[in-house]
Design a protein with these regions (language model features):
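Conserved catalytic core of the tyrosine transesterase superfamily
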Residues: 1-296
C-alpha cells in the first residue's frame, strides 16, 4: 500500500528521491505508532482520533509545529491517494486543522560575508581539490540560487561552457537553464582538472575525496562550517545562500518574474517571500532620502 503510493509519487507526480524518502519516513512512523499504541496494522481502517493521538505524541517529542504539519501533510496525501484509487470512501484527515506556526524570517547573508567566505578558501589548510570544490559549491549556490538537492545531482554534461549555462533538474523533474558567471566558470575549470585525478569518467559533477557522489549532509556541513567563521546569524545553510541570491538580485532591481524563473518556482507567490527583505531596504532608503522623513 505504502509502496504503491511512493511509486505514484515517483512516476506520476515526478517527485524527487529526497521528497519521496521524507514521505516514506513519515508514513512508516505513523504505521509504527499504530502498531505500538493500537496493535493495528491495517492503514485502511484508521480513524481521526487515532491520527489525533499520533499528533499529540509528536507534540510531546518537542519537535516544531512546522515539522509536525509536514508529517501530517504526508499522511493526508497518502489518504487522498487511497481515496482516489477507491481503497477508502473518505479521508480521515479531511477536517484536520494544521497546528499554528510562527512565521519564519529568513535572514540572508550580506555580500561582505559571502565575499569573505569566497576569499577565505585560499587560506584553508586543505587539499587543493577540497578547497576548490568547496569554493565552487559556495559560488554556485550564490550565483545561481539552486537548491541543495539540485546541486548534488548536477552532471558534468549539464554544464555548457559555450553558452555559459548549467542545466538544473528541479522539483518534479522540471528542467531549467541558469547562467554562469565568468568567475564561476574559472573555478569550475580548475575543479574539473583536479577532479580527473579522483574519478575519471564519473558523471556526477561534485564528488568526495574518495571519488563518490557528494551527499546532502556534507554539502550542509561545508556551508555551515565556512559561514560560521564570518557570520553570527543563527541559521547558516545552503537555503540561506539561495535566499541571499534572490534577495540581493531584487535589491539591485531585478524583475520578480526573472528571479522566479532562475529559482525554478512554479508560482510567483513562492518568489514573493523574498521581497520582504527588499521592501525593508526600500523603506530604509526612503526614510533616509525623503526631505520630510525626519520631520515630526
Amino acid at each position: 500500500m505504502i509502496t504503491a503510493f511512493l511509486e505514484y509519487l515517483s512516476l506520476e507526480k515526478k517527485y524527487s528521491v529526497h521528497t519521496i524518502t521524507a514521505y516514506k519516513k513519515d508514513l512508516i512512523s505513523f504505521r509504527d505508532f499504530l502498531v505500538i499504541e493500537y496493535a493495528q496494522e491495517n492503514l485502511l481502517e484508521v480513524n481521526y482520533p487515532q491520527i489525533r493521538s499520533w499528533v499529540v505524541a509528536l507534540v510531546e517529542t518537542k519537535i516544531s509545529n512546522r515539522t509536525i504539519n509536514r508529517k501530517v501533510s504526508s499522511l493526508k496525501s497518502f489518504y487522498k491517494f487511497l481515496q482516489k484509487t477507491k481503497q477508502i470512501d473518505g479521508n480521515p484527515l479531511s477536517k484536520h486543522k494544521a497546528l499554528k506556526t510562527e512565521k519564519r524570517v529568513q535572514v540572508p547573508f550580506t555580500s561582505n560575508e559571502i565575499n569573505a567566505v569566497i576569499n577565505h578558501f585560499e587560506k584553508e589548510g586543505q587539499s587543493e581539490f577540497v578547497s576548490v570544490r568547496n569554493k565552487l559549491i559556495v559560488e554556485l549556490f550564490y550565483s545561481t540560487g539552486i537548491r541543495r538537492a539540485e546541486l548534488i545531482n548536477i552532471k558534468e554534461r549539464d554544464v555548457s561552457f559555450s553558452d555559459k549555462t548549467i542545466k538544473v533538474l528541479g522539483k518534479r523533474n522540471k528542467e531549467r537553464f541558469v547562467p554562469l558567471l565568468s568567475s564561476v566558470i574559472q573555478t569550475l575549470n580548475r575543479y574539473l582538472e583536479l577532479k580527473a585525478a579522483f574519478a575519471i569518467g564519473l558523471e556526477e559533477l561534485f564528488i568526495t575525496e574518495k571519488g563518490n557522489k557528494i551527499y546532502e549532509t556534507l554539502v550542509y556541513r561545508i556551508i555551515n562550517s565556512y559561514f560560521s567563521k564570518v557570520s553570527s546569524k543563527q541559521k547558516k545553510s545552503p537555503h540561506i545562500l539561495r535566499h541571499s541570491f534572490a534577495t540581493h538580485l531584487l535589491n539591485e532591481g531585478a524583475d520578480l518574474n526573472s528571479v522566479k524563473e532562475l529559482l525554478g518556482h512554479s508560482s510567483l507567490a513562492s518568489t514573493q517571500v523574498y521581497t520582504q527583505n527588499s521592501l525593508d531596504v526600500i523603506k530604509k532608503v526612503y526614510n533616509q532620502a525623503h526631505p520630510r522623513s525626519h520631520k515630526k
